[in-house]
Amino acid sequence: MGIEQVIDRYCEAWSTKERAKRAEIVNEVWAESGTYSDPRSDVRGREALVGLIDAANVQFPPGIEIKRTSAVDAHHNVARFAWALSGEGISMEGIDIAFLSDDGTRLERVIGFFGPLAPEA
């Protein structure tokens, strides 16, 4: 699986409603002790990530999707990509920075940013 496929599967985990399927995807693409942080969260490990996604899915209306909206820009097993969350009555965009394992098959760290960058003042 290439870097783009790993990232797309990771985004799919956020959109998946079934916990068992979500956990399966996370186990496939997430390093055992991988970390995720964004302005609201900071978790370590697969189970913690699944729990975070569980909590997020409770807050969002049914049918939300998170999809990658840019090409994956990557070098030296570090990647950045834009994403968008959309669904009934909600939309959000952001950028994630992802650090991958040496073989490029698992995410070891993801740092998420919400919203577009503000122009320089």
What spans do the regions from the language model cover?
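Short acidic-aromatic low-complexity motifs
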Residues: 1-29
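Aromatic side chains
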Residues: 10, 30, 36, 81-83, ...
